[in-house]
């Protein structure tokens, strides 16, 4: 049995200077909102926003470009739509504590009536980290932080009180109400394709894996590596939805 291909649309928010420049920020948001509702009317399965704080480095005169924050804008799009799934491609794990992110995700799942997909990754845009005062840890540390974050988020979404102590993060008797509408929790999409660490996190935590760059041949290779990680922990490789 073959699965139906699902289609998602990245909604303009300013990342590549993709909002009209001759109108107010409010009108720019309304432009993006209208595209989101249009996508829903055309039966797109999902809409997505990028989680960055600065426009792409390819944008000229970035100080002149409107660029909306991901989670705030996605909450507004959740209210403007009724059935389309909503997600981040992908949330930067470094920008919010995992306990706060769990609370934000549960709230957005309630606002949207159970339509959240939590897209998350390690983060990579180093100049953005520097501009906003975030520590840019080595890749291996960022991946391990992501692993701990997903442990915390999953616990807070599924347990009345959650406790966890790792190397980088800890919570004690953390309560997350409202709990997510989706059970056992909203789908978790993990972006990234590092073979030793990131794909191991995908195998452990992800309901969906996003492979964002590369040729079909590279995708095939990465999937073979992901399958190996799944086999190591007894995870069904086919239980992870693949996205590009």
Model feature map: region roles:
Residues 1-80, 184-186:
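N-terminal beta1-alpha1-beta2 module of alpha/beta enzyme domains
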Residues 2-5, 61, 88, 94-205, ...:
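Internal, glycine-rich beta/alpha segment that forms the wall or movable "lid"
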Residues 45, 82, 207-209:
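Receiver (REC) domain switch/active-site residues of two-component response regulators
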Residues 55-56, 64-66, 93-99, 213-221:
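Acidic-and-aromatic substrate-binding clefts and catalytic sites of carbohydrate-active enzymes
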Residues 81-89:
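Conserved catalytic cysteine-centered active-site region
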């Amino acid at each position: 049995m073959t699965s139906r291909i699902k289609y998602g649309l990245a909604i303009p928010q300013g990342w590549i200077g993709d909002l009209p420049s001759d109108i107010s920020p409010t009108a720019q948001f309304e432009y993006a909102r209208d595209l989101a509702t249009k996508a829903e009317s055309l039966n797109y399965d999902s809409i997505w926003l990028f989680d960055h704080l600065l426009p792409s480095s390819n944008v000229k005169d970035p100080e002149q470009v409107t660029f909306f924050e991901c989670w705030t804008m996605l909450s507004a799009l959740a209210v403007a739509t009724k059935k389309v799934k909503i997600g981040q491609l992908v949330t930067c794990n470094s920008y919010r504590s995992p306990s706060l992110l769990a609370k934000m995700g549960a709230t957005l799942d309630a606002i949207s009536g159970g339509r959240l997909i939590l897209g998350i990754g390690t983060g990579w845009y180093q100049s953005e980290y520097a501009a906003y005062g975030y520590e840019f840890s080595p890749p291996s540390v960022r991946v391990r932080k992501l692993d701990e974050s997903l442990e915390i988020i999953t616990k807070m979404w599924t347990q009345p009180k959650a406790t966890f102590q790792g190397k980088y993060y800890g919570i004690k008797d953390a309560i997350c109400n409202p709990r997510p509408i989706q059970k056992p929790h909203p789908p978790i999409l993990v972006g990234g394709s590092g073979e030793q660490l990131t794909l191991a996190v995908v195998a452990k935590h992800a309901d969906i894996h996003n492979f964002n760059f590369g040729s079909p041949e590279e995708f095939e290779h990465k999937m073979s590596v992901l399958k190996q990680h799944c086999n190591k922990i007894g995870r069904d490789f086919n239980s992870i939805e693949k996205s590009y």
